[in-house]
Amino acid sequence: MKIQFKFLVNIFLFLFLLNSCDNQEDSNNDETIGLEIHQEDQLEGKKELNGFQIAYKVVEKSNYYTVKVAINDVRLVASIDYDTEFIEIDGKNVVLSSKEKETLLMIGEEISAYLFKDGSVDDFTMAEFTLLKLLEYWAKSPSNYSYEKIVFKGNQTNLVKGNDDGITCIRKNTYVTAVYDDNEGQIYRDRELVNGDRCLGRCGSGCPGVFSIASAWTKDCLDHDQCGRVLGGSTNPFDRNCGDEYAQAADDFLFGVLRGCRG
């Protein structure tokens, strides 16, 4: 009887210690991204990174998502309704430095590594998806880009310059004509191979993606990529000529994957 009791006590202690270790590991992982709240309808945290104080928050209510990201005193805000494909993105015309953009990518990479630490990239909440997509979108703006207010309502937008194709899926390894313009309004048309030169047409930079999450392949993203290749730098294809193409790709970043634009 004593032996049986001692055996049960040892089993209990083993399970208690095992659970404590798991909880400690989860707590340590939370701290790496400054996570404070992690629920299906909310993701929130803050931490110091790369010399900046970063705060992020995404909240869902009736499939309407509000995202707020702060880097020191700079605030970036977005509202997304996935039912109606409504987007409003506003940065109050702030211009981020290259280091600030680098920091947004860094926090996104850390959050992505935390969320997909088990290797699966298909199991995510829409709150997680929305935050990662916006972090990448904001971080990959053209040089000296002013984060003006952008509004998409279905196929309509407040943008007045450029050629917005809505969310038009394109297929990898096919030829599609990219249409874009420069800062003077001159229009260019180039027939290009989708998935050619550094993954032309992918909503995001390079291959594989910056974060471990599915990406869309769309016409607006092709237009922006080709604009950058021709009018931007050879290694960092983002400049003032391609700001309108960048803005027009906002809905592609967020809704392209959900529309099935996976190439």
Which residues make up each language-model segment?
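Bacterial signal peptide processing site
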Residues: 22-24
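Extended terminal accessory/targeting regions
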Residues: 26-263
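C-terminal motif of bacterial Sec signal peptides marking the signal peptidase cleavage site
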Residues: 17-20
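Bacterial N-terminal signal peptides that target proteins for export
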Residues: 1-9
